[in-house]
Regions:
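Conserved mixed alpha/beta catalytic, RNA-binding, or beta-rich assembly cores of soluble enzyme
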Residues: 59-127
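Hydrophobic, well-ordered secondary-structure segments
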Residues: 104, 108, 134, 175-178
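Extended, compositionally biased
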Residues: 116-162
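Conserved active-site and cofactor/substrate-binding residues in soluble primary-metabolism enzymes
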Residues: 29, 33, 95-98, 102, ...
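A residue-level signal for conserved active-site and pocket-lining positions in enzyme catalytic cores
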Residues: 181
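Immediate flanking context of iron-sulfur cluster ligation sites
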Residues: 125, 160-178
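Active-site helix-to-loop segments that bind/position phosphate- or nucleotide-bearing substrates
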Residues: 1-88
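Conserved small/polar residues in nucleotide/adenosyl-binding loops
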Residues: 184-186
Length: 186
């Protein structure tokens, strides 16, 4: 399945952004300007399956898929780097990580709606499940606009493979599904 998602940052996210990435509050105007430039470039999608057909995953109910911000976030960071604007490139990368975290939440909500179950745990390949599942996931969800390189790297760079454990009972707030979510890709 393919699901359009629209990640964005809330007012609460701005405070978290500054503390998480060690920016002083006086950088917020620059950060917001880069965010304003980036947001129209983000073309985010989740490609996923709720079939229980991955080898080596023994959960009773789960979904798996790929979440991407599209090429725009990568291109903006690269544009800044090409012009030797390192701080701006770093800010763009940090913003895209926050947007990707928000996209994971939206992916989990889409899975909940499709499956009529609750997302109770979100895992990234390489954490609890082997990276060797990536080609299988890629083949099953057939993501247009995402490429898997010969070295099992996903392009665009702001793309992640996830497995969501599902249950009939809600156990956690979606923001609490993954212990590594606050550390991911840093």
């Amino acid at each position: 399945m393919k699901c359009k998602i629209t990640p964005e940052l809330s007012s609460k996210d701005w405070k978290e952004f500054c503390s998480r990435f060690h920016f002083d509050n006086d950088k917020l105007p620059l950060i917001r300007a880069i965010y304003t430039a980036m947001l129209p470039l983000v073309d985010a999608f989740a490609y996923y399956s709720i079939k229980q057909d991955l080898p080596g995953v023994s959960l009773a109910h789960y979904a798996y898929g790929l979440v991407t911000l599209g090429n725009g976030a990568d291109e903006l960071s690269e544009l800044y780097l090409n012009h030797e604007q390192l701080e701006e490139a770093y800010i763009a990368d940090c913003l895209s990580l926050m947007l990707l975290s928000n996209a994971y939440e939206q992916f989990a909500k889409a899975v909940e709606e499709e499956s009529s179950l609750y997302a109770i745990e979100l895992s990234f390949l390489g954490d609890e499940y082997p990276l060797e599942l990536l080609p299988e996931i890629f083949e099953h969800v057939s993501p247009d606009g995402i490429h898997l390189t010969g070295s099992n790297m996903l392009m665009p760079l702001k793309t992640a493979a996830l497995i969501i454990k599902l249950d009939s009972q809600k156990q956690k707030n979606i923001k609490e599904l993954c212990n590594t979510l606050s550390l991911i890709h840093i």
